[in-house]
Amino acid sequence: MSGISLFGVRPVNRRCRIRALCICNSHPANRTFVPQTPEPETAMSSRKFGLNLVVVLAIAALFTGFWALINRPVSAPNWPEQISGFSYSPFQQGQFPQKDQYPTDDEMRRDLEIMSKLTDNIRIYSVDGTLQDIPKLAEEFGLRVTLGIWISPDQERNEREITRAIELANTSRSVVRVVVGNEAIFRKEITAKELSVLLDRVRAAVKVPVTTSEQWHVWEEHPELAKHVDLIAAHVLPYWEFIPVDKAGQFVFDRARDLKKMFPKKPLLLSEVGWPSNGRMRGGADASPADQAIYLRTLVNKLNRQGFNYFVIEAFDQPWKASDEGSVGAYWGVFNAARQQKFNFEGPVVAIPQWRVLAIGSVVLALLSLTLLMIDGSALRQRGRTFLTFIAFLCGSVLVWIGYDYSQQYSTWFSLTVGFLLALGALGVFIVLLTEAHELAEAVWIHKRRREFLPVVGDSDYRPKVSIHVPCYNEPPEMVKQTLNALANLDYPDFEVLIIDNNTKDPAVWEPVRDYCATLGPRFKFFHVSPLAGFKGGALNYLIPHTAKDAEVIAVIDSDYCVHPNWLKHMVPHFADPKIAVVQSPQDYRDQNESTFKKLCYAEYKGFFHIGMVTRNDRDAIIQHGTMTMTRRSVLEELGWADWCICEDAELGLRVFEKGLSAAYYHDSYGKGLMPDTFIDFKKQRFRWAYGAIQIIKRHTRSLLRGKDTELTRGQRYHFLAGWLPWVADGMNIFFTVGALLWSAAMIIVPQRVDPPLLIFAIPPLALFVFKVGKIIFLYRRAVGVNLKDAFCAALAGLALSHTIAKAVLYGFFTSSIPFFRTPKNADNHGFWVAISEAREELFIMLLLWGAALGIFLVQGIPSNDMRFWVAMLLVQSLPYVAALIMAFLSSLPKPATAPEPAPVV
């Protein structure tokens, strides 16, 4: 791992390069060395560096160009010197009228000074609290006030507002009109008849014009209101009507024309016109700073030219409105809550004025990610380096975009907490995505494997004595006999077989195995021990002192494995290298054609041993498995099997690496076993593996995370952590699913107040899901060599285990141990309803997600992209649970009448 560079180019001397031309770890007698004249290292490295630099610069330019493209300047009319008026709510950030928190006179005076530079008119909505001081303060700045009376179901408050407003209208020179109620009919808080009574009362008590302010269509629905007002005050807000911004201006003028035609004798006041700068999309209406700037700058100029009276809603952002109107309610101001101008009044409009800073930030973040991805990346082909460069820049750009977009939100303690958790989740998603991309690149786009442990076939090679240990617990005797027959046929000069049956209660199960061993000769020894603690690890530890004293290697296979005759002959000679402590062959299976269920299981199993283990072997970081594995006896006697861990094999392999020893792996099969017969057994097996992984991480945190007191290399630490990271991500996904369901429930119960989560937080998990499924299909096609159908089967089976893995991860973090679960062999399949009940948790969560999606569709519809995206996310989130049900159903189908014979092993 030395010689790290951004581009994966490591300077090596000429001797090292020549040695790399031969197989590094085959036995000397079998090495083939072809002399080659190496290209001068300096010239080759310079050429590679130059090519990598060009690729990085090209991709950096591509993403920077994308930032420039989405932020290209758009022309719009300059803001006029004066507009007709501003709607004004004076609440500062952190103030809530619902809690009777009102601004001070000094705060309102500063607001009025800002507005007085742009208009002569303001509209207020209430005279409650300190808002009654606004008319007096407005006189200081020469502002005319349209006074509002807030009408609500609270009759006592209504009476206070009316009395106070009448007094202000009759005593303040700044009040030029009175508005009784704001969308009170639209909110169904009062009827048109009741409002007419209030209007008549106020008109009789004041000398200025009186009206009520409603959405334009309310005036069309209740034309009788016109008899009780002096002018028509209408809200025309195209955003709420799902009108795209490019058609919104014409929509305003069309509605104004209709109202003038309907009420020709009444003056028209457009009492609210505006556009929000943030919030959910509504159909084609996008709430963005650029759209707000373009729309308002264009609209107010046209309104001025045509002589309309209007109020722009609103002068200042009002974060408190989010609780009543949804998040978009906070963002209608021309100035933000800190009283800063939100967009430029002159010149071209740019969506994100500081986009260059963001582009630079994304490049820096991408280069940091790429540096980590390219550590020890000299073996990657150019296509692999290009792919990782693209992924790094994509992740960097999206992360910067997420950070920027979230920074533009108004936050409460609740939203900050949720945002922080979502940000951590998004960061975790991108870390997982980068590690998945790294594995993909190293599996497909690599010059050659760094550590090839090919079969050693020379007759004169190192052939030490091997002791083969076969642990059994409650296994079918006939199956174990097949395993013993295969061992008896091994083509190897010196080996013994120790079979241990621990804790099997029924003599009819273990005694036939004991008797059969007696017929196979002195090589085979049988042990039955009950009780014996420590699960499988305890049984294997029991056999160590009973191993022949001259045995140098201890091999372990599961009781269902039929091994190839050449297994020991081909693989044991690798122990001639004193650094090699473990030699591992892949797990493989012979019953994949027994049922559709097992075909899917087989496809899923195959990937790890032909993709993950192969790439891990390049950095000497394989996962040791408790079958088809061999360990140097001296090492095993020193370390022993961990009886505290339910994945004692993987834990032993890690301790081997921690001592600075090495492992050898060859990806071809030398033995085949049996897969689980039912979905519940398939799940329990994977639960044990994932739970054991968390046990190991917890026990070895010091060496894995900190590199303390260990001989682990950085590459080994990376592979152990990165290899288990997707499982940890599955565990964290449970919290995301629960959060999504709770949020969706709120969207259904109070749709007017709860919007879908920000798109920026819904995209990362969806992107990771799509990438992982695509990666599985691509890698199975390229690295494993299967057809598209089998690749899809692997993806389906893998998805079906997501919930099981998630549970195992959470159990692993919050418990210290669970009972060891043996995977049954030759078990009967379950009926349909039993199989479905074994996936009842997945079924329940799937129905919840589908119900949430349906509920949102029925209550809110899917009028906007963010709503469609959220519903799609809920449905995609349900796919792993659907996959689990499919697997459960397939496992319930009847088996063939007779089980197939063990297939020949290769």
Model-derived features: positions:
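Short, acidic, metal-binding catalytic loop of nucleotide-sugar glycosyltransferases
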Residues: 484-494
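Membrane-embedded multi-pass helical conduit in multi-pass membrane proteins
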Residues: 382-431, 458, 726-819, 835-906
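The conserved acidic donor/metal-binding loop of glycosyltransferases
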Residues: 558-562
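Cell-envelope/extracellular polymer assembly enzymes that use nucleotide-activated donors
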Residues: 465-467, 496, 651
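Aromatic- and acid-rich polysaccharide-binding/catalytic face
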Residues: 147, 176, 214-255, 275-276
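Aromatic-rich peripheral "rim/lid" segments of glycoside hydrolase catalytic domains that contact
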Residues: 77-80, 93, 97-100, 281-291, ...
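A conserved acidic beta->alpha catalytic loop
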Residues: 493, 501-513, 530-533
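Long helical/loop segments within the catalytic core of UDP-sugar-dependent glycosyltransferases
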Residues: 515-552, 565-646, 651, 657-658, ...
